[in-house]
């Protein structure tokens, strides 16, 4: 459960991401594909090379979903319901992959926002991404 301080930290950190959200989303995906090659199996139709338009496009989708989750941090289950349905029923993404992408997002944010990425912000973002992952996997049951 996100505390009021966590919510404040997440909103402030995501506010710093701003216009770079899509780029950071794409970078996190690239990190995931390189670090965890099995995740590529969900994207057989993508050009997964560095700078690929398809990876950039999906990175923007990831970032937009996270922006939506930040905006609706108190009601993520409703805000992410359609996305949860998509990943559980149509795409059938293994839930472990959300943890892998979350890790890569944290690394990407730490690399780009070193001054803002304090231990408290790191912990808050980690809890937030875990909450998003929980919501996205809630319809697997």
From Swiss-Prot:
Tissues and organs where the protein is expressed, per its UniProt entry: Red blood cells.
Phosphoserine found at: 3, 35, 49, 102, 124, 131, 138
Positions that bind O2: 58
One Gene Ontology CC term in the entry: haptoglobin-hemoglobin complex
GO molecular function annotations of the record: heme binding; iron ion binding; oxygen binding; oxygen carrier activity
All copies of domain Globin, residue ranges: 1-141
Modified residues (N6-acetyllysine): 16
Pfam (any one): Globin
This protein's UniProt keywords: Acetylation, Heme, Iron, Metal-binding, Oxygen transport, Phosphoprotein, Transport
GO biological process, one term: cellular oxidant detoxification
Annotated positions of the Phosphothreonine modification: 8, 108, 134, 137
Binding site for heme b: 87
PTM-bearing positions, type N6-succinyllysine: 7, 11, 16, 40
Modification Phosphotyrosine, positions: 24
Highest taxon, organism lineage: Eukaryota
Self-association and partners: Heterotetramer of two alpha chains and two beta chains.
Protein family: Belongs to the globin family.
Chain's role: Involved in oxygen transport from the lung to the various peripheral tissues.
Name of the protein this chain belongs to: Hemoglobin subunit alpha
Top-level taxonomy: Eukaryota, Metazoa, Chordata, Craniata, Vertebrata
GN (gene name): HBA
